[in-house]
């Protein structure tokens, strides 16, 4: 690659007509990161010897789980070999988006920074529910959609069938669907030429006050928060004072630049360009995704549209297995929060589990990733309590409370309880349709509609309570459909429901870690299941231990752990029956006394086992 060509993508203040901002919308495992690797490789911004798989996924966990958690971006030079712009030196800015349902807000901000999107679908699997949801987001924002089938080198690929499916969804001709292989690089140059031709160039007012959209922010140990922005109007220069419009805080710009493929310092950014700012801020919550950056002096008065605070949808308690790890857990969560503004937490005390934190997450994947990172990056051993959602409870006297934790459930009579609802989309092969519908109905789902995407794939839409799907819904769905179903959900208001709190009592004492808020119809099932499970997990004591499930003061299920008995008659060889009776009576008295004063200690392993499988049938 010539030196002249090598430099031009690193220089900023490019005319908007030469810029193309685009992203790749794809499901987990459909080859988005591999395609991004090929694009970087072909454009020559990375020397072949420096190339590594999943180049844009920086986090070890991202590479291992094969998912993109944070949005990344890279600026690359490209000279099209075909189409209307043949031979022109264009600048492509690829914004890599997270593909998972929990990170929809991040995806919508990243889409806001683009004018076009490559819809990437695995030629052996077809489109998945989450890709469909992100596609609709992109269509709402009027992005130019370029449909592409990836992995055409696979023996199982069926490009004819899935080209037709994509054409039906987007409303184009099957011939317009491009076919590429991220692995071999086949069709990738043609794809980039198509991007240059079809994606419109950015439009903005270069003379207006600066306005830049934050689409991601990452915490760097040495430089503080690195904020990724897309310039909408005006320009930002190095060493200027800037202002965040949602909070009104002002900062000095210590460094401004572009990513190509590593951070490269520049003099500034102008309309349509994507780059990064470093302001010395130490907390990502001060540099919020979706916020507008402007100049502190003579800045814009109107922020960009669409900013929203990320709202936790699922709550769970995290407790260290050994109490002396509590300070380390606090420090670890605070460090994670530096990089993840949507994670919220507050200290919580449980009688059974000791000190820990009640954490709020965007969804189940977010929760699992956070927990995995805490355990792996910080070496902690954790117990997480069963996930719960936020209920709005109106008591008899009209007071309204929001319950995030079963132990905060108010006692006495309640006027009404409202639970969060979600609109759920499931794409499933027709053969598994019956089992999937049965599962959704058992979880109190109301069917909204059903569409056949192709002859053998169906899209189902349900309105379902969020509390029903956060437990084991996904696992049950996968096992009923042999792993072929895909799922997406988005919040859809709230609805009144007949919910009760089920307490689990050991010897008449409630154990807070096992309490759950369930629908009245499922209360007996949950109570019986937990009682049977705990009977197997808690070791036998010297006295009989009753395990009970209760709603308020009404017992709905009971199991007994039989007492261990010493054979007091072992020494009696023959002799009078009254002697034996006396010994047995004496033992019985002792057991009775023990039962009154004895306490049951539940081993940690029992907590871990009961809570980790709390949602399974």
Swiss-Prot record:
Alphabetical keyword list: Cell membrane, GTP-binding, Hydrolase, Membrane, Nucleotide-binding, Protein biosynthesis
Subcellular localization, per the record? Cell membrane
Q: Which reaction equation describes what this protein catalyses?
A: GTP + H2O = GDP + phosphate + H(+)
Query: Is Kinase one of the keywords UniProt gives this record?
Result: no
Q: Which GO terms describe its biological process?
A: positive regulation of translation
One MF term in GO for this entry? translation elongation factor activity
Domain of life of the native organism: Bacteria
- What Pfam families does the record point to? EFG_C, GTP_EFTU, LepA_C
Q: Per its database record, what is this protein's job? A: Required for accurate and efficient protein synthesis under certain stress conditions. May act as a fidelity factor of the translation reaction, by catalyzing a one-codon backward translocation of tRNAs on improperly translocated ribosomes. Back-translocation proceeds from a post-translocation (POST) complex to a pre-translocation (PRE) complex, thus giving elongation factor G a second chance to translocate the tRNAs correctly. Binds to ribosomes in a GTP-dependent manner.
Family affiliation:
Belongs to the TRAFAC class translation factor GTPase superfamily. Classic translation factor GTPase family. LepA subfamily.
Name the record gives this protein: Elongation factor 4
């Amino acid at each position: 690659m010539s030196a002249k060509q090598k430099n031009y993508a690193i220089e900023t203040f490019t005319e908007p007509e030469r810029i193309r901002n685009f992203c790749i919308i794809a499901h987990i495992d459909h080859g988005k990161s591999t395609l991004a690797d090929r694009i970087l490789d072909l454009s020559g911004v990375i020397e072949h010897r420096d190339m590594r798989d999943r180049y844009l996924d920086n986090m070890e966990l991202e590479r291992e789980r094969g998912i993109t958690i944070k949005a990344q971006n890279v600026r690359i030079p490209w000279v099209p070999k075909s189409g209307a712009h043949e031979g022109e030196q264009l600048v492509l800015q690829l914004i890599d988006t997270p593909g998972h349902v929990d990170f929809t807000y991040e995806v919508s901000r990243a889409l806001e920074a683009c004018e076009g999107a490559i819809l990437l679908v695995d030629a052996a699997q077809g489109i998945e529910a989450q890709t469909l949801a992100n596609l609709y987001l992109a269509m709402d924002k009027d992005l130019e959609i370029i449909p592409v089938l990836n992995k055409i080198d696979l023996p199982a690929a069926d490009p004819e069938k899935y080209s037709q499916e994509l054409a039906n969804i987007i409303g184009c001709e099957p011939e317009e669907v491009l076919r590429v292989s991220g692995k071999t690089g086949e069709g990738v140059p043609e794809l980039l030429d198509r991007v240059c031709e079809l994606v419109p160039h950015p439009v903005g007012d270069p003379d207006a006050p600066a306005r830049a959209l934050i689409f991601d922010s990452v915490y760097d140990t040495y430089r503080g928060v690195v904020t990724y922005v897309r310039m909408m109007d005006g320009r930002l220069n190095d060493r200027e004072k800037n202002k965040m419009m949602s909070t009104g805080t002002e900062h000095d710009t210590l460094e401004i630049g572009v990513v190509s493929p590593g951070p490269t310092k520049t003099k500034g950014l102008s309309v349509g360009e994507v780059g990064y700012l470093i302001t010395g801020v130490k907390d990502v919550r001060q540099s919020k995704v979706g916020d507008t950056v402007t100049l502190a002096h003579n800045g814009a008065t109107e922020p960009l549209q669409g900013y929203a605070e990320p709202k936790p949808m699922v709550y769970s308690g995290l407790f260290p297995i050994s109490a002396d790890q509590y300070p380390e857990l606090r420090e670890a969560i605070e460090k994670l929060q530096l990089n993840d503004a949507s994670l919220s937490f507050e200290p919580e005390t449980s009688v059974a589990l000791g000190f820990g934190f009640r954490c709020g997450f965007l969804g189940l994947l977010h929760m699992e990733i956070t927990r995995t990172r805490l355990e792996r990056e910080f070496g902690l051993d954790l117990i997480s309590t069963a996930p719960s959602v936020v209920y709005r409870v109106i008591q008899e006297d009209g007071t309204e409370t929001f319950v995030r934790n079963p132990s905060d459930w108010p006692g006495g009579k309640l006027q009404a309880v409202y639970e969060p609802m979600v609109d759920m989309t499931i794409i499933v092969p027709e053969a598994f349709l019956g089992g999937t519908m049965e599962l959704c109905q058992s979880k109190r789902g109301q069917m909204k509609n059903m569409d056949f995407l192709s002859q053998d794939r169906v899209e189902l839409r349900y309105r379902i309570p969020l509390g029903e799907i956060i437990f084991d819904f996904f696992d049950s769905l996968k096992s009923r459909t042999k792993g072929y179903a895909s799922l997406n959900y988005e919040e859809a208001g709230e609805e009144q429901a007949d919910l009760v709190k089920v307490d689990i009592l050991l010897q008449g004492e409630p154990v807070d870690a096992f309490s759950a808020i369930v629908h009245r119809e499922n209360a007996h099932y949950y109570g019986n299941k937990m009682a049977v499970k705990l009977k197997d997990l808690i070791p036998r004591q010297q006295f009989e231990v009753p395990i009970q499930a209760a709603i308020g003061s009404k017992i709905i299920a009971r199991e007994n752990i039989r007492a261990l008995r010493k054979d007091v008659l072992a020494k009696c060889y023959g002799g009078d029956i009254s002697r034996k009776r006396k010994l047995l009576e004496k033992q019985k008295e002792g057991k009775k006394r023990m039962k009154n004063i004895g306490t049951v200690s539940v081993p940690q392993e029992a907590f871990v086992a009961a809570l980790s499988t709390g949602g399974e049938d």
